[in-house]
Swiss-Prot record:
Its cofactor is Mg(2+). Major role in the synthesis of nucleoside triphosphates other than ATP. The ATP gamma phosphate is transferred to the NDP beta phosphate via a ping-pong mechanism, using a phosphorylated active-site intermediate. (Microbial infection) Catalyzes the phosphorylation of dZDP to dZTP, when the bacterium is infected by a phage that produces the substrate for the synthesis of dZTP (2- amino-2'-deoxyadenosine 5'-triphosphate), which is then used by the phage as a DNA polymerase substrate. It is found in: Cytoplasm. Its main location: cytoplasm. Pathway: Purine metabolism. Pfam families: NDK. This is Nucleoside diphosphate kinase. The active site is at H115. Homotetramer. GO terms for biological process: CTP biosynthetic process; GTP biosynthetic process; UTP biosynthetic process. The lineage of its organism: Bacteria, Bacillati, Cyanobacteriota, Cyanophyceae, Synechococcales. GO terms for cellular component: cytoplasm.
Length: 149
């Protein structure tokens, strides 16, 4: 079953949106298999955003993501990577559709509440970076037969 990595950024944590955001994913039918709150080290943040290292916003992004606690999440479900991206919405909250997490709660591109893996391969890398195998739960929800054929 497909998995994705989600991070509720410091602005989402500070604004008390963690439960609401997790609820949206659960209501969609995705299974929570990893969950933890932490204040990322600079090294971890730089590894996570390494693809942006040469971009002008890199240092600001690393400073922001390490400025407070984040909630790291692993979700599981059919098509979860693409579906989670749709639920999250466009990177810029000002252009994100109403009903998406960023459209409903985001303020600006630098404070856009949440990160979600953009591809299956990226999700695998991000999950391995943020979680050890022992931190992930393998379980079967009783509603699974009602979700998947």
């Amino acid at each position: 079953m497909e998995r994705t990595f989600i991070a509720i950024k410091p602005d989402g944590v500070q604004r008390g949106l963690v439960g609401t955001i997790i609820g949206r994913f659960e209501q969609k039918g995705f299974k929570l298999v990893g969950l933890k709150q932490l204040k990322p080290s600079r090294e971890l943040a730089e590894q996570h955003y390494a693809v942006h290292r040469e971009r002008p916003f890199f240092n600001g992004l690393v400073e922001f993501i390490t400025s407070g606690p984040i909630v790291a999440i692993v979700l599981e479900g059919e098509g979860v990577v693409a579906a989670a991206r749709k639920l999250i919405g466009a990177t810029n909250p000002l252009t994100a559709e109403p009903g998406t997490i960023r459209g409903d709660f985001g303020v600006n591109i630098g404070r856009n509440i949440i990160h979600g893996s953009d591809a299956i391969e990226t999700a695998q890398q991000e999950i391995a970076l943020w979680f050890s195998p022992a931190e992930l739960s393998d379980w079967t929800p009783t509603i699974q037969p009602w979700l998947y054929e």
